[in-house]
From Swiss-Prot:
Reaction(s) catalysed by this chain's protein: Random hydrolysis of (1->4)-beta-D-mannosidic linkages in mannans, galactomannans and glucomannans
Native source organism of the sequence: Arabidopsis thaliana
EC class: hydrolase
EC number(s) reported in the record: 3.2.1.78
Gene Ontology molecular function: mannan endo-1,4-beta-mannosidase activity
Places the protein is found: Secreted
Secreted keyword on record: yes
Family: Belongs to the glycosyl hydrolase 5 (cellulase A) family.
Gene name for this UniProt entry: MAN3
Gene3D superfamilies per UniProt: Glycosidases
Protein name as it appears in the record: Mannan endo-1,4-beta-mannosidase 3
Keywords associated with the record: Glycoprotein, Glycosidase, Hydrolase, Secreted, Signal
């Protein structure tokens, strides 16, 4: 307990120093760009291991809890994790970023500023998502409700994709985000190389049009708009990766049946010119709960391999596995099962990366700090616990580091 208190105190002091003295980048890293199926950083192929931490801006809104961001980022660097994916939204509700259309809470925005500044200081790249598909933290539903309150004829969350006013709300949010001047670094978000890229939405879906045409049209319009206001950053969709009508065989063999009505199309959505890299997620335990563990592992490998094959041959773009994990509340769960999921995932990513393929990295869901019980769920991981899973994560980071010319490959398992 004394040791933990010391670590927390140290993190607080570091956070205060970052705020008081200004923030300097931990390295001279520039913007991540794309060349064919590879990401490029400072003239070299960029591969990275990473994690999700959706809560960064929320916790950093309160200056007394900002040490949690510092502590998690410091632990991430110990394990050679170099990308974090987080939310660039909180629409309405407690600690909202966007209180009403175009109206922002400065304190919450400064929380996101701090998270970006700390990532910059510690050499971590960020992928930031503009809005949520789900009603958690506002999402599409909140945008539609805002429009409805003005008298717009909207009745479904899927009106988000077609109503002109709602679409303008989204564009306004994008414009506000990219033009934000970070209060710590004094750099506009659109000029900040710490931000690796943006995502249009977290897990976009449109049940009103299972053909996928509505969602593809919306993505095309919004992707072009994002590029018109920020030409420096990469952009992806935030998709789970379910196949659509453009890939009928993949749709039949890989999608869970429930996904066929979600209106997404992995190929069509990512073939858009303004989309720079492919996004997929992987949760076989949630998608196929009735299968046994071995069958789910086989499906996991096939899911990744098929998407990587399509990224290479059809999309000709890099791919990031934006979310994956093993829920601890899965019936019969064991630590060995979670380790097997992480090993299978990382092995597939590494095999592609080693050959110069499109796999750029995997971001597990999700990291929390000690004592963050309000964010704990069946998928959360505390890096400081040094579990066997964390050891597997570290090994993958070091292997990818060897490919990009950093670090050394361990001769033995950690």
């Amino acid at each position: 307990m004394k040791c933990l208190c010391f670590v927390v105190l140290l993190a607080i002091l570091i956070a205060q120093n970052s705020s008081d003295l200004g923030v300097k980048s931990a390295s001279s890293d520039g913007f991540v760009s794309r060349k064919g199926v590879q990401f490029i950083l400072n003239g070299k192929p960029f591969y990275a291991n990473g994690f999700n931490a959706y809560w960064l801006a929320y916790e950093a809104t309160d200056s007394t809890t900002r040490f949690k961001i510092t502590y998690v980022f410091q632990n991430a660097t110990i394990h050679d994790l170099t990308i974090v994916r987080t939310w660039g939204f909180r629409d309405g509700g407690y600690r909202a970023l966007q209180i009403a259309p175009g109206v922002y809470d400065e304190k919450t925005f400064q929380g996101l500023d701090f998270a970006i500044a700390e990532a910059k200081r510690l050499g971590i790249k960020m992928i930031i998502t503009f809005v949520n598909n789900y009603s958690d933290f506002g999402g599409r539903k909140q945008y539609v409700d805002w429009a409805k309150n003005t008298g717009q004829n909207v009745s479904s969350d899927d009106d988000f994709y077609t109503n002109p006013l709602v679409k303008q709300y989204y564009k306004n949010h994008v414009k506000t985000m990219v033009n934000r001047v970070n209060t710590f670094t004094k750099v506009e978000y659109k000029d900040e190389p710490t931000i690796m890229g943006w995502e249009l939405m977290n897990e976009p879906q449109c049940r009103a049009d299972p053909s996928g045409k509505t969602l593809t049209a919306w993505m095309n319009e919004m992707a072009l708009y994002v590029k018109s206001v920020d030409s420096k950053h990469l952009l992806s969709t935030g998709l789970e990766g379910f196949y659509g009508d453009s890939s009928p065989q993949r749709k039949t063999s890989l999608n869970p049946v429930a996904a066929n009505v979600l209106g997404t199309d992995f190929i069509a959505n990512h073939k858009l010119d303004a989309i720079d890299f492919a996004s997929i997620h992987s949760y076989p335990d949630l998608w196929f709960p009735n299968l046994d563990e071995k069958s789910r592992l086989n499906l996991l490998r096939k899911w990744l391999e098929c998407h990587l094959e399509d990224a290479q041959n059809i999309l000709k773009k890099p791919l990031i596995l934006g979310e994956f994990g093993k829920p601890t509340n899965t019936p019969g769960y064991t630590q060995a099962q979670r380790d097997a999921v992480f090993n299978a995932t990382f092995d597939t990513i590494y095999e592609s990366a080693e050959k110069g393929g499109p796999a750029a990295g995997a971001l597990f869901w999700h990291v929390i700090s000690d004592g963050m019980n309000n964010f704990k769920d069946p998928l959360s991981i505390v890096l400081s616990e040094n579990s066997t899973t964390v050891n597997i994560i570290t090994e993958e980071s070091r292997k990818l580091g060897l490919i990009r010319g950093k670090g050394k490959l361990s001769k033995t398992k950690i």
